[in-house]
C-alpha cells in the first residue's frame, strides 16, 4: 500500500506576493490556481508560479507548516524561502 503524501507549497503571484497552501498534488493545485479556480487571493493575482514545496508524511504537519507561513511577515517569508534553497532573484 502506498502512503499518501501531503504538501505545503508556496506560489509567487504576478504582483510578487506569496501564497502558501496545502495539497496532495502540487502540480495539479498550481494549475488550478492559474485557471482561476483556486483561492480568491490567487484568482486576482494570476499568473502564479510554484516557488517551493515541502513533503510531509501526515496532513497535520503540512497544515501546520501552511499556517505558520501564512502568519509571517513578508521579510520572514523571504528568509524562510532563502533558508530552504530558494534564491531571492526567484521572487
Swiss-Prot record:
<protein>
    <recommendedName>
        <fullName>UPF0213 protein LCA_1266</fullName>
    </recommendedName>
</protein>
<feature type="domain" description="GIY-YIG">
    <location>
        <begin position="4"/>
        <end position="79"/>
    </location>
</feature>
<dbReference type="InterPro" id="IPR000305">
    <property type="entry name" value="GIY-YIG_endonuc"/>
</dbReference>
<dbReference type="InterPro" id="IPR035901">
    <property type="entry name" value="GIY-YIG_endonuc_sf"/>
</dbReference>
<comment type="similarity">
    <text>Belongs to the UPF0213 family.</text>
</comment>
<dbReference type="InterPro" id="IPR050190">
    <property type="entry name" value="UPF0213_domain"/>
</dbReference>
<dbReference type="Pfam" id="PF01541">
    <property type="entry name" value="GIY-YIG"/>
</dbReference>
